[in-house]
């Protein structure tokens, strides 16, 4: 899962949106640096990542990547799940329009920015102003996201080419998303993530 899905599942679980978004920028035990609700959000994010990586649908989808891109498949798939969530938001969350959800999430996350790592603050400068969460629905933007990550981390250069794997298996990936994401939403609503 990437930013949008983590925020959405956190909302459904009544968890800290701030902690769920911050988690990738925190190493080790967060309890000494953040309030308990943010800490719980960080741990929820970590549980979701482990659970998602082990879902049969996700393991199957990783196998569809070519040898040269399989190493980055988990990252590429995380971004792709956000694409499907953004694209189908009106079906998934008909009572909370995406634009309103993004404004709500931004307000929640803004409360922790003064005490956050600089890299997280930098991400937030772009995430909200450039409307990444809304733009995830556009596959051209997904390609830009993958290229941007490859530019920032040369060891992940294969992300550029992983776009072709997404394109080649688009319909099958979308089908897998519909298999697992509603289950995750139900688990979040039961606070079982």
From Swiss-Prot:
The keyword Transmembrane helix does not apply. InterPro entries: ACP_PD, ACP_phosphodiesterase_gpbac. Its EC number is 3.1.4.14. GO terms for molecular function: [acyl-carrier-protein] phosphodiesterase activity. The keyword Membrane does not apply. Coiled coil: none annotated. It catalyses: holo-[ACP] + H2O = apo-[ACP] + (R)-4'-phosphopantetheine + H(+). Keywords: Fatty acid biosynthesis, Fatty acid metabolism, Hydrolase, Lipid biosynthesis, Lipid metabolism. It is an enzyme of class 3 (hydrolase). GO terms for biological process: fatty acid biosynthetic process. Pfam families: ACP_PD. Converts holo-ACP to apo-ACP by hydrolytic cleavage of the phosphopantetheine prosthetic group from ACP. Belongs to the AcpH family. This is Acyl carrier protein phosphodiesterase. It comes from Salmonella dublin (strain CT_02021853). The gene is acpH.
């Amino acid at each position: 899962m990437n930013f949008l899905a983590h925020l959405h599942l956190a909302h459904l679980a009544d968890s800290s949106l701030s902690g769920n978004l911050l988690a990738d920028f925190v190493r080790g035990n967060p309890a000494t640096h953040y309030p308990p609700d943010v800490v719980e959000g960080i741990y929820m994010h970590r549980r979701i990542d482990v659970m998602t990586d082990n879902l049969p649908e996700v393991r199957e989808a990783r196998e569809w990547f070519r040898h040269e891109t399989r190493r980055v498949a988990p990252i590429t798939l995380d971004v792709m799940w956000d694409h499907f969530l953004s694209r189908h938001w009106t079906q998934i969350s008909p009572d909370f329009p995406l634009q309103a959800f993004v404004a709500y999430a931004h307000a929640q996350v803004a409360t922790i920015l003064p005490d956050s790592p600089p890299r997280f603050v930098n991400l937030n400068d772009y995430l909200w102003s450039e409307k990444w969460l809304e733009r995830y629905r556009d596959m051209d933007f997904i390609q830009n996201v993958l290229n941007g990550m490859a530019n920032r981390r040369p060891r992940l250069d294969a992300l550029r080419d992983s776009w072709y794997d997404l394109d080649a298996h688009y319909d099958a990936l979308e089908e897998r998303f519909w298999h697992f994401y509603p289950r995750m939403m139900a688990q979040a609503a039961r606070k079982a993530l």
